[in-house]
Amino acid sequence: MFVDIRDFTPFAESNTAEDTVARLNALFEIVVPAVVDAGGHVNKFLGDGALAVFGAPNDLVDHADRAVSVARLILRRVDERFGGALRIGIGINTGAVIAGTIGGGGKLEFTLIGDTVNVAARVVQLTKTTGDALLLTQSCIDALAFRPPGLINRGSHALKGKSAAVQVFTLDPEIPAST
């Protein structure tokens, strides 16, 4: 799962460094606890975004359901905290990843690599094109134990580095998650 702030560059250009960092930290204060409370792990912060994983390094049978539930929670909490002053996109993909500690020269870092991660990164960028706050890949939908209400097919999209188009879906924000 990738979380990315929309239109962050103009905000950073028109605000102080302190305000910019405070805005990022305010978002991450929402993202990190939501992910961790659901058994996930925030792998890294990437500028104005974050990469979270459910099911690595420890396997979670319901990883896709947890990711979708957390994404909805993050979107709701961001809206409650910021209103329209901060817009984010979330992209979720499901599949095998290579997870491990890499590095050298005394600097080691747990990281995730592979096609699944790359597709999730491309899908979060696709939210800017579709205008959706959340996009899920077909792989994510297929891994769900429970199909969420309000699922909307956004069609197949060509993604950089992929020979085949990737089917994506969003969730109608007006339809609440089932309890």
Language model features: what each stretch is:
Residues 1-2, 41-44, 51, 87-93, ...:
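Structured core elements
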Residues 1-69, 110:
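Catalytic NTP-binding/metal-coordinating core of nucleotidyl cyclase/transferase enzymes
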Residues 9, 51-52, 98-99, 141-142:
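Nucleotide phosphate-binding site architecture
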Residues 20-23, 27, 46, 63, ...:
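Helical mechanochemical/support elements of P-loop NTPase systems and associated helical scaffolds
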Residues 25-40, 56-90, 115-124, 138, ...:
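Alpha-helical scaffold within the catalytic cores of cyclic-nucleotide enzymes
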Residues 53-63, 90-110, 126-130:
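Catalytic strand-loop-helix junctions within cyclic-nucleotide turnover domains
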Residues 84, 96, 104-106, 160-163:
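Short flexible coil/turn linkers enriched for glycine and charged/polar residues
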Residues 120, 126-179:
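Cytosolic regulatory/linker segments at or just downstream of nucleotide-handling modules
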